[in-house]
Design a protein with these regions (language model features):
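Ligand-recognition elements built from short beta-strands and adjacent flexible loops
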Residues: 38-39
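Basic nucleic-acid-binding interfaces
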Residues: 1-35, 44-77
Length: 77
């Protein structure tokens, strides 16, 4: 199992992530799974919502781009 730090580095390098790896990063950022309908999960933290669509093995690039912004915000403070 990869640590969250390694998963963040993998994300920032531009590598593909599985939905399970994305969930670990979201939990580390303080997000909590609020609800799920089908393959779409709604994660909430501090009034912000993040939707994770799990349609296949790898998460689509546009979701990874949004997650990358969240990780960079946490790093910058």
């Amino acid at each position: 199992m990869a640590t969250v730090k390694k998963l963040r580095e993998k994300l920032l390098r531009g590598s593909r992530l599985s939905s399970q790896e994305v969930r670990k990063i979201l939990q580390d950022l303080g997000y909590v799974l609020a609800r799920q309908k089908g393959s779409h999960e709604q994660w909430i933290a501090g009034g912000r919502t993040f939707t994770l669509a799990c349609h296949g093995k790898e998460v689509p690039h546009y979701i990874l781009d949004a997650l990358k912004k969240l990780v960079e915000e946490k790093i910058d403070g």
